[in-house]
A protein has these predicted regions:
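Membrane-proximal intracellular helices of multi-pass ion channels
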Residues: 1-461
Length: 461
């Protein structure tokens, strides 16, 4: 009598090139790897004009560049050599588009096979709705980024080449990529350390080009994909509509409030013409959402203006964009959930769509954790700098770090080693934390009763 033999099933290993770790771990470790390499390169004597840069300052700069923040402890133009500036720009580009996005693109270009885990990770990194669409979206993302940056470079050449000569080409390249990636780094320290775009407060052309680049990078690649396909499909997803509507609300609303608050302030907008005041208010509103460039002296702004900008920095840009923060859709879900509750509903409704409860819970969790991180770090920094810095300035700077914005009122330059490490953690969490949190909170769909309204899907965080 023969014995029944059963073959033991063995799980086939995932042969994808990103196999071996979860999506959250891969995203976090990839950013940490880039930061580590960037730190090593920036500590080389060839990277700085003086030939010496401390490890902590190099790590802070690498973290700020990779997390596309823009907070600096050493002025980019006056302290770093051309080699160092190139390293910083490379970190910005990798951090803005994402290491996962770039490596996925090169893997596809080399015709390498991507496993299921790889596709899922790629889909999360570009906020693609569905694995089958991930590779298609990836190609569009790279093309869009290259196109926007090329256009920005060409437009800025007309302003910077006449001003700086041949060096204007490099200034144009650096500024365009930094603006599109919402990084906030600049090469205008030649006009004074940490001057940012203050020397261009009356140059409407430069401001307009940079605003365009900031908006392009901050809307999110999936929104641009839908806008590119709008002529064929004649419709936008709920996600794209929410991103566009609330982005405009925050851009315009922020500009109006800043103009009202700073209109007569002689140290900020008071000395500008009426068109100059309007332009400065609009530029600062757009930049505050995660770009980190300024045309007015932020330290001279009123406390209420700083508080307003802190909120805008905390909100940030759109999911799948080059910007940070808790994301505009996350904040939109919170606001519209509050509205729904005020109307007596027990669910969140946006544009005639019922938003799944797990999306609402995810948004609330991201905002609460983000608030704890931002304001918790503000308390710690204030405790260490209370003699020279106000509490409002600490809140402003901490929201800038968490929102990966890069705007500064002078606090960062006064940080001790411990506070620098805290802000590095804040920048890292602001860049990869919300994304990682959204992934880790993703649950399997349950068997809830069908609602009367159609279900809407929005990427948050």
């Amino acid at each position: 009598m023969g014995k029944n033999k059963t073959k033991k099933r063995t799980r086939r290993p995932n042969k994808g090139w990103l196999a071996g770790s979860s999506a959250t771990q891969t995203i976090c470790s990839s950013f940490l790897l880039v930061i580590a390499v960037g730190t090593l390169l920036l500590t080389l004597p060839i990277s700085s004009r003086t030939g010496r840069l401390g490890v902590i300052d190099a790590m802070f700069t690498a973290t700020s560049a990779t997390c596309v923040t823009g907070l600096i402890v050493r002025d980019t133009w006056s302290q770093f050599s051309l080699f160092g500036q190139i390293i910083i720009l490379m970190l910005i580009q990798v951090g803005g588009l994402g290491l996962v996005t770039l490596t996925s693109f090169f893997a596809l270009a080399a015709r390498r096979r991507m496993g299921f885990r790889d596709l899922r990770l790629l889909g999360e990194s570009v906020s693609a709705d569905g694995l089958s669409k991930a590779t298609e979206v990836l190609k569009i993302v790279i093309k869009l980024a290259a196109a926007f940056e090329a256009v920005g470079i060409v437009l800025l050449l007309f302003a910077f080449v006449p001003q700086f000569g041949a060096e204007g080409v490099w200034v144009s390249v650096f500024t365009a990529i930094s603006a599109f990636c919402n990084a906030g780094f600049d090469l205008f320290g030649r006009f004074g350390d940490y001057s940012s775009l203050v020397p261009y407060v009356n140059n409407y052309y430069v401001q307009a080009v940079i605003m365009f680049m900031i908006m392009a990078g901050g809307l999110g690649f999936m929104v641009w994909v839908e806008l590119a396909e709008y002529r064929k499909k004649r419709r936008l997803s709920l996600h794209a509509k929410v991103v566009l509507q609330f982005s405009v609300i925050f851009w315009v609303g922020g500009a109006v409030l800043l103009a009202l608050l700073e209109w007569s302030n002689p140290r900020t907008m008071g000395g500008l013409s009426v068109p100059g005041k309007i332009m400065a208010a609009l530029f600062q509103s757009v930049s505050t959402r995660t770009a980190g460039m300024n045309t007015i002296d932020l330290a001279a702004c009123s406390p209420i203006s700083k508080l307003l900008m802190s909120v805008l920095q905390f909100i940030g840009a759109a999911p799948g964009s080059t910007g940070g923060g808790v994301k505009v859709t996350t904040f939109a879900v919170l606001i519209l959930t509050i509205r729904s509750v005020a109307q007596g509903r027990d669910d969140c409704v946006i544009g005639g769509h019922h938003i799944e409860s797990k999306t609402v819970y995810r948004a609330l969790t991201i905002i609460v954790i983000g608030a704890v991180a931002a304001f918790g770090s503000a308390v710690v920094v204030y405790y260490n700098t209370a003699e020279t810095v106000s509490v409002i300035d600490c809140i402003f700077e901490s929201c800038s770090a968490f929102g990966t914005v890069g705007l500064s009122v002078g606090v960062t330059g006064q940080l001790n080693t411990g506070a620098k490490l805290l802000y590095m953690a804040c920048m890292f969490m602001g860049r990869v934390g919300p994304v990682s949190l959204a992934i880790s909170l993703t649950a399997k769909p349950d068997d809830n009763k069908r609602k009367v309204l159609p279900v809407g899907h929005i990427n948050v965080g």
